[in-house]
Amino acid sequence: MAASIAAATASAALQQVVARPAPVAGWLTFGGSGARPGATASTVGPLRASWFAPLAGTVTSQPLVARNVPRKGDTTVYVATSAGFVYALAANGYVRWRVDLGRFVLPACPQVPDGWGVTGTPVIDPATRTLYVVDAFGRLHAFDLATGAERAGWPVVLYRDYRRELVWGAMLLVDGAVYAGTGAYCDLPMEGKLIRVSLADRKVSGWTVVPPELGGGGGIWGWGGVAYSPRRDSLYVVTGNAFEGGTNKGAAFSEAAGYGEHLVELSPGLDVRSSDAPAPTGFTDLDFVGSPVVADPSGCDELIVAQAKNGMFFAWNADDVPSGPAWSLKLQKADPGAPLLTQPTWSSRFRSFYVATASKLVRIRLDAACKPQIAWQTTLGDATLYPSPTVAGGNVWLGLPVKDLSGVAEALLGVDAATGRVKVRRPIQGVSFAPPTVVAGTLFLASMHGLDAGGFPLARGRPASALDAYQSASDAAHRWQSREDGVYSTEDGGRHWHRIYPRYAAQVLRISKTTGLISVGSPATSCGCATRQLWTQNGGKSWRSAVVGQSYTASRGAVYWWTDNTLFLAAPNLRSSTRIAQTEDTIVSGTPVAGGIAALVDRREKAPQVILAQGAGTRLITLPAASPNTVVRTIRGIGGDLVVRGTSVATSTADPARVEWTSKDGGQTWSAPS
């Protein structure tokens, strides 16, 4: 008996070891690590056609890549968009999961075309296999890497005044805490903050850059957010200018009041350890809008480097920040119309920093005496904003948002890190402002039109899929490739392919430039993803297109669809569409009703509205008012009733309250919100 018990115990132990998931590795935070170097030893081989995934919303954050998720040997790419969507994509572009966190539209600040959803790059905790991301309403979410399910007790509210504060930069994960810095919308009044959330108890604490009595301001704007030095166990942020107000006004006004326009070193508990405000040079707007980078050059002191809008590159000795910059360089002319807005990259292999200015890619090399030298400058072309570069192997990679000297626009550039020679120039879909991500020889680049893998969109071939292909007679007639994990379409005989994601299990539209909307069908998946819409208003002479989410519904053979604030009815032959309603605010959802559609309009600080389109008649119905902090999401037919659902985003830190309106007469009248 003892022997059999021992054997059973050994077997159970063996099963435990086998079942333990493989460790998560990859590119888990902005820049590859908390130091924000933006460099990796991984090399990128010859670029080849791969895949292009159209996403709902503009992408300004860096894609993250986790290997061994969801299973050993798998790779998953995580991308967040300004429309408030977070995607988990397989290595072949297949959508594993997607969540909609909502977006905030602020007409006074239209810097991002889709409104404000997720701007800062999320961070991955490999130990708990969790993705942390902040939405536009100041909520820090925790999602299971494999499933997208929210962890128990989350989200946590970081700040409640989401109309004045925004997390611009990347999250940082250090020793059981997540950090996020806040800025504002278009320099609207606010107080910049560094916020800490303890993952063990979800306790929120913060440090204010410039207190209100000094006028506030001091936003933490940089794409890299907060940097971390393991050697000093310190956090580093650089800040924007203080605003005029309180005692900081008149002749006493200073943009460096409080900790405005400073490099600040803080403990993990948010106590200030040291700081410095460099003297202004050029125009006085010395905002730091890149993020600090921690560099560890062999044989030299550890450096903290950052760039300012006036074209200056500063380097501080990490052990002596208060003494001011150890050295500085002027990289471009001080120009308010084309400020230096990018993030530097550090390569220990080449002992060099790489910076994209308003017109050039610059290599700053540290010599044997630890002195900076401009090794080379490669002209790129004039642009207001370049993305930050990434060093992978022997090349520097970055997106090109304007035409370069060869006339190529919207391209991925590969530049020799040693010589500055342009070795690779590949066209991409749309402008890219995010640094490339390189893992295991594959390059992922987020653009204003979606995500490119391998550096450019699908070309000369069909995309890879995890599932077997299925092609209907209609697909063959229109030269479309349909797959169970989505719909792919071609508009040029197969040279390029477009993937169209279904939104609901019961509906999918197949579309093309030549025939418009041509079918409504049932895909074999319940994947909730984005949909590419093309439409014509002149009988097919010209077409417009957009990538949007949750944007159409079919009602007894009629197809209704919407983009932003306009509702359309497709013609019976589906070759054109007619505009049937237009609002001042955003249409977010729709559902079939008798003889037509009920479409939900989100008006943020006002009561939501419902467009009721039935037959030839259209009515605009205003629902009973709810809290101004309510965001409406969906309208659905449930058990014979129509139900509008929303969320109060400032009610509870752990369980945001759901708000509902109900109509029992097909949308004519509505109950007060509950």
What are the residue ranges of the model-derived segments?
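Trp- and S/T/G-rich repeat-edge/linker motifs of beta-rich repeat architectures
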Residues: 459-464, 495-503, 538-548, 575-583, ...
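Conserved Ser/Thr-centered positions that define the repeating blades of beta-propeller domains
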Residues: 420, 490-491, 536-537, 569-571, ...
